[in-house]
């Protein structure tokens, strides 16, 4: 490929602390009425002094450890100065000169196999407020309203090196990061609610000439799919400009969900534009060896480690293990099921197909469903005893999922118990053979597919309730013995 994208990400993770970064206002403000979770500190009133949230610092250290970062025992807060309607103080408290962590990495399944994406820095900062645009998009809004509730909500910003080689890899990185912060319990990672936000920097290299375009920042991508789509669009836009011999402007562009395009928002700021200087009202953060060791002991088993254990303990293929461990809740559900039904591979197949289909259709997590390990114990027992076929099991599963009823109850109510009476099935097959000698002859002349005719006959006569395995065995026995 002549043109190659070079992508780096700047990711904001909203931390699930009880209170905001520097005051006692609640941090969970998503569903609160506008401007109801604010105080003199988070709105920057004169004389109000910030007090750092220890839980925020602990969450940042946990995340940095999970991302293989170098933790700095000494870090400091700084003021990032800029004007925007949702920033009442006129500056944002962040970490610029001495971040809490640097030099990490996250392994992902890249386009050409396993790869490490380096993490340049991880630092703490407070969130700004939120502009609510009245119109179908930011570019066509007739006016905007300001909600200050989000001011002061604690964030960690994670900045990667430009190691990402495609829009797909950017999406995969984001999905993996969300999985990790959820495992750690430091964030919900919900992009739709703004708990995980991504700005991407993309440039394009012409591999034939070595020429590289200016870097463009892309914002307003509030789902994993939009991260990939926005970067695909921007890559194509930059390539077309380069092919025309045009210079690509260094700017910030926003993803427009309506038009599926990126639109210019403003020129790209330089870091010097923010006039960073040390925050005079907050002392440095100093971490002891004992504190770091204590936090390290709190780390849970993370997705990659859990996937390796699933492969080792349950003899699962790598793909199954990765899917099951992509969600902490799904992995826990699987292990609870294994305790009740010790058939890991069968359970994995059901969870990865039927369960995930139902969850995705409803856009919910496994913890929000009515499904329990006991449902699988009941379902597998029905199949093992020959009372229902796997076909019937899959047909009733959506109702099991929706209602929480036990499979045996649904089977009983709907009269779906499988017929496993050998004598009855044998009589039906013999009757079909007597009435259809041509099908018998076809089978004997080598057309083995003719057996399907007799299967269909038995299923019609029993309204689909005949045990398919038993039916096939009897048909083969009678046809071979003719």
Swiss-Prot record:
What is the name listed in the Swiss-Prot or TrEMBL entry for this protein? Aspartyl/glutamyl-tRNA(Asn/Gln) amidotransferase subunit B
Role of this protein:
Allows the formation of correctly charged Asn-tRNA(Asn) or Gln-tRNA(Gln) through the transamidation of misacylated Asp-tRNA(Asn) or Glu-tRNA(Gln) in organisms which lack either or both of asparaginyl-tRNA or glutaminyl-tRNA synthetases. The reaction takes place in the presence of glutamine and ATP through an activated phospho-Asp-tRNA(Asn) or phospho-Glu-tRNA(Gln).
Taxonomic placement? Bacteria, Thermotogati, Thermotogota, Thermotogae, Thermotogales
Q: Which organism is it from?
A: Thermotoga petrophila (strain ATCC BAA-488 / DSM 13995 / JCM 10881 / RKU-1)
Which family is this sequence assigned to? Belongs to the GatB/GatE family. GatB subfamily.
| InterPro entries the record matches | Asn/Gln-tRNA_amidoTrfase_suB/E (IPR017959), Asn/Gln-tRNA_Trfase_suB/E_cat (IPR006075), Asn/Gln_amidotransferase (IPR018027), Asn/Gln_tRNA_amidoTrase-B-like (IPR003789), GatB (IPR004413), GatB_C_1 (IPR042114), GatB_Yqey_C_2 (IPR023168), Gln-tRNA_amidoTrfase_suB_CS (IPR017958)
EC number, as in UniProt = 6.3.5.-
State the superkingdom: Bacteria
Record field: catalytic activity: L-glutamyl-tRNA(Gln) + L-glutamine + ATP + H2O = L-glutaminyl-tRNA(Gln) + L-glutamate + ADP + phosphate + H(+); L-aspartyl-tRNA(Asn) + L-glutamine + ATP + H2O = L-asparaginyl-tRNA(Asn) + L-glutamate + ADP + phosphate + 2 H(+)
Q: What UniProt keywords apply to this chain's record, in alphabetical order?
A: ATP-binding, Ligase, Nucleotide-binding, Protein biosynthesis
Its EC top class is ligase
Any one biological process term the GO annotation gives:
translation
SMART domains, per this entry? GatB_Yqey
Q: What assembly does the database describe for this protein?
A: Heterotrimer of A, B and C subunits.
This entry's Gene Ontology molecular function terms read: asparaginyl-tRNA synthase (glutamine-hydrolyzing) activity; ATP binding; glutaminyl-tRNA synthase (glutamine-hydrolyzing) activity
Tell me yes or no: is Hydrolase among this UniProt entry's keywords: no
């Amino acid at each position: 490929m002549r043109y190659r994208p070079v992508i780096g990400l700047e990711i904001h993770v909203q931390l699930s602390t009880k209170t905001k970064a520097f005051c006692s206002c609640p941090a969970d403000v998503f569903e609160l009425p506008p401007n109801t979770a604010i105080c003199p500190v988070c709105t920057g009133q004169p004389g109000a002094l910030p007090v750092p949230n220890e839980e925020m610092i602990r969450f940042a250290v946990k995340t940095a450890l999970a991302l293989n970062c170098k933790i700095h025992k000494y870090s400091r807060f700084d003021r990032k100065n800029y004007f925007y309607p949702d920033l009442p103080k006129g500056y944002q408290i962040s970490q610029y000169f001495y971040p809490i962590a640097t030099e990490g990495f996250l392994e992902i399944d890249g386009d050409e196999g396993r790869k490490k994406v380096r993490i340049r820095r991880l630092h703490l900062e407070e969130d700004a407020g939120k502009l609510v645009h009245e119109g179908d998009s930011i570019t066509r809004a007739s006016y905007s309203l300001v909600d200050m509730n989000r001011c002061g909500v604690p964030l960690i910003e994670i900045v990667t090196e430009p190691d990402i080689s495609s829009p797909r890899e950017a999406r995969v990185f984001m999905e993996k990061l969300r999985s990790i912060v959820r495992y750690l319990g430091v964030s919900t990672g919900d992009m739709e609610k703004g708990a995980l936000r991504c700005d991407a920097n993309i440039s394009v290299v012409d591999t034939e000439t070595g020429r590289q375009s200016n870097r463009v920042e892309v914002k307003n991508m509030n789902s994993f799919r939009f991260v990939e789509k926005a970067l695909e669009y921007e890559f194509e836009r930059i390539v077309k400009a380069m092919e025309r011999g045009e210079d690509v402007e260094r700017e910030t562009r926003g993803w427009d969900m309506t038009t599926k395009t990126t639109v210019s928002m403003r020129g790209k700021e330089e870091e010097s534009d923010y006039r960073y200087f040390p925050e005079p009202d907050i002392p440095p953060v100093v971490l002891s060896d004992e504190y770091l060791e204590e936090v390290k002991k709190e780390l849970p088993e993370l997705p990659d480690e859990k996937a390796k254990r699933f492969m080792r303990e349950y003899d699962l293929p790598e793909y199954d293990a990765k899917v099951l461990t992509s969600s902490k809740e799904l992995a826990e559900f699987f292990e609870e099921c294994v305790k009740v039904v010790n058939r890991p591979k069968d359970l994995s197949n059901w969870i990865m197909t039927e369960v995930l289909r139902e969850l995705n259709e409803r856009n919910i997590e496994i913890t929000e469903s009515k499904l329990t390990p006991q449902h699988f114990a009941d379902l597998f027992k029905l199949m093992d005893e020959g009372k229902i076929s796997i076909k019937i099991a899959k047909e009733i599963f959506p109702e099991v999922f929706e209602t929480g009823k036990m499979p045996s109850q649904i089977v009983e109510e709907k009269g779906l118990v499988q017929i496993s009476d050998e004598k009855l099935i044998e009589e039906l097959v013999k009757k079909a053979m007597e009435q259809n000698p041509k099908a018998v002859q076809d089978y004997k002349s080598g057309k083995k597919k003719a057996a399907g005719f007799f299967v269909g006959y038995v299923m019609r006569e029993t309204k689909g309730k005949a045990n398919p395995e038993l039916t096939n065995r009897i048909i083969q026995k009678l046809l071979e013995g003719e």
